[in-house]
């Protein structure tokens, strides 16, 4: 059964899971809130604090590099990408959004590890502020659900 508002299942159990989080520092006021909401939800779902590894990188383009290092260690049941890209006046927004997203997806497929992508992309700061908590919670829920699903399928 899926939640009425979101695509994640209602009952999730993270008790046995090891989760890696990579957080971009760029737009740190937003990404810190994303990370806090994500961590709180992981703990609420039963993931043990000692089984959560959280690292920081400069920006969204560096997130896939750290995710790859974590995926190569084969210690994590799921990974989470956290970042915030706000549109500016140049093409840089599209470049960073597209490349970071493609990198995250490629890693999930190449390493067969679920990666919840919460690198939020918005037109302005107001949109980012409105999404920061919800998207952090969503990322935690997606990571736990997908880790459990892949375990069930293996």
From Swiss-Prot:
Keywords: Riboflavin biosynthesis, Transferase. The active site is at residue 92. It catalyses: (2S)-2-hydroxy-3-oxobutyl phosphate + 5-amino-6-(D-ribitylamino)uracil = 6,7-dimethyl-8-(1-D-ribityl)lumazine + phosphate + 2 H2O + H(+). SUPFAM superfamilies: Lumazine synthase. (2S)-2-hydroxy-3-oxobutyl phosphate binds at residues 89-90, 131. One of its GO terms (biological process) is riboflavin biosynthetic process. Its EC number is 2.5.1.78. It comes from the Bacteria. It holds the Pfam family DMRL_synthase. One of its GO terms (molecular function) is 6,7-dimethyl-8-ribityllumazine synthase activity. Disulfide bonds: none annotated. The keyword Transferase applies. 5-amino-6-(D-ribitylamino)uracil binds at residues 26, 60-62, 84-86, 117. Pathway: Cofactor biosynthesis; riboflavin biosynthesis; riboflavin from 2-hydroxy-3-oxobutyl phosphate and 5-amino-6-(D-ribitylamino)uracil: step 1/2. One of its GO terms (cellular component) is cytosol. NCBIfam families: lumazine-synth. Belongs to the DMRL synthase family. This is 6,7-dimethyl-8-ribityllumazine synthase. The lineage of its organism: Bacteria, Pseudomonadati, Pseudomonadota, Betaproteobacteria, Burkholderiales.
């Amino acid at each position: 059964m899926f939640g009425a508002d979101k695509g994640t299942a209602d009952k999730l159990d993270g008790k046995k899971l090891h989760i890696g989080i990579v957080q971009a520092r760029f737009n740190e006021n937003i990404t810190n809130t994303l990370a806090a909401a994500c961590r709180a939800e992981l703990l609420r779902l039963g993931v043990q604090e000692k089984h959560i590894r959280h690292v920081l990188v400069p920006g969204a383009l560096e997130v896939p590099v750290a995710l790859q290092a974590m995926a190569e260690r084969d210690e994590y049941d799921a990974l989470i990408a956290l970042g915030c890209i706000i549109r500016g006046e140049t093409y840089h927004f599209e470049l960073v959004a597209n490349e970071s997203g493609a990198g995250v997806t490629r890693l999930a497929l190449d390493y067969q590890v679920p990666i919840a992508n919460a690198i939020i992309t918005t037109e302005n700061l107001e949109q980012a502020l409105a999404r920061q908590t919800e998207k952090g919670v969503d990322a935690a829920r997606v990571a736990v659900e997908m880790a459990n699903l892949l375990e069930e399928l293996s």
